[in-house]
């Protein structure tokens, strides 16, 4: 199977996670951010992730891909209950996290930005909706304090380092991509249980953290 992705994209990370958790091989293909032609040819519009199944048919939508791959062998992993507290935490933090993440994505060495045109496409599109990246970076300190406070609240909710609620569930698929991308932000205080969970999930899913390129 082949998975077409952007490295920074949280929806792509969700799809990548299930392959790592189940130890199923997948061929990753990173599309350029300004390449509309390839995904449109596959699924009719510019979006990622896109899974090319073994029968060569294409499947978009991250959670559809997660459920498809999880059930392929008849032994699904994501059988745990979801937590309303985790859902509420994600809703709160996702409300502002992009103000920290988007301007940092734009400065980072992701393969989807490997041409100047691809990087410019991302900057132009995201600044139009999120605001000027230089302004957002200038306001980082307050947002970093907010995220550090919110991570302290999350620390109390983590049951085990290998599954946020004690048993693997969709909450892990929703939570880890955000934590992984937040490793791109320098200066965040990571509480110990959150850090252990983040690091353990990175190993389980075979997805790299971004700490070495933090801004």
Swiss-Prot record:
Instruction: Specify the domain of life of the species encoding this protein.
Output: Bacteria
The record lists its disulfide bonds as: 9-12
Query: Is Disulfide bond found in the keyword set?
Result: yes
Keyword annotations: Disulfide bond, Electron transport, Redox-active center, Transport
Entries under Pfam families matching the protein: Glutaredoxin2_C, GST_N_3
Q: Which CDD domains match?
A: GST_C_GRX2, GST_N_GRX2
Keyword Signal assigned: no
InterPro entries hit by this protein: GLR_AS (IPR011767), Glutaredoxin2_C (IPR007494), Glutathione-S-Trfase_C_sf (IPR036282), Glutathione_S-Trfase_N (IPR004045), Grx2 (IPR011901), Thioredoxin-like_sf (IPR036249)
| A single GO cellular-component term on record | cytosol
Which Gene3D superfamilies does the annotation name?
1.20.1050.10, Glutaredoxin
The terms under GO molecular function for this entry are: glutathione disulfide oxidoreductase activity
In this chain the GST N-terminal domain maps to 1-77
Similarity annotation: Belongs to the glutaredoxin family.
Relate the protein's function as given in its record: Involved in reducing some disulfide bonds in a coupled system with glutathione reductase. Does not act as hydrogen donor for ribonucleotide reductase.
Q: What is this protein called?
A: Glutaredoxin 2
- What is the species of this protein? Escherichia coli (strain K12)
């Amino acid at each position: 199977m082949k998975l077409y992705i952007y490295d920074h994209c949280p929806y792509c990370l969700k799809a990548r996670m299930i392959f790592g958790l189940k130890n199923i091989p997948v061929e990753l293909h990173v599309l350029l951010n300004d390449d509309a032609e390839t995904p449109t040819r596959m699924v009719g519009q510019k979006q990622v992730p896109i899974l090319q199944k073994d029968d060569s048919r294409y499947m978009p939508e991250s959670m559809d891909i997660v459920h498809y791959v999880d059930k392929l062998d008849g032994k699904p992993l994501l059988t745990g209950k979801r937590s309303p507290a985790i859902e509420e935490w994600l809703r709160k933090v996702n409300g502002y996290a992009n103000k920290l993440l988007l301007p940092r994505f734009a400065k980072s060495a992701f393969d989807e930005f490997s041409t100047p045109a691809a990087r410019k496409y991302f900057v132009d599109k995201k600044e139009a909706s999120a605001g000027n990246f230089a302004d957002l970076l200038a306001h980082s300190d307050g947002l970093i304090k907010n995220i550090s406070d919110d991570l302290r609240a999350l620390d109390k909710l983590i049951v085990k380092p290998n599954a946020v609620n004690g048993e693997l569930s969709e909450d892990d698929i929703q939570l880890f991509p955000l934590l992984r991308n937040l490793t791109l932000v320098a200066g965040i205080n990571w509480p110990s249980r959150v850090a252990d969970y983040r690091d353990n999930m990175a190993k389980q899913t075979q997805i790299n953290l971004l700490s070495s390129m933090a801004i």
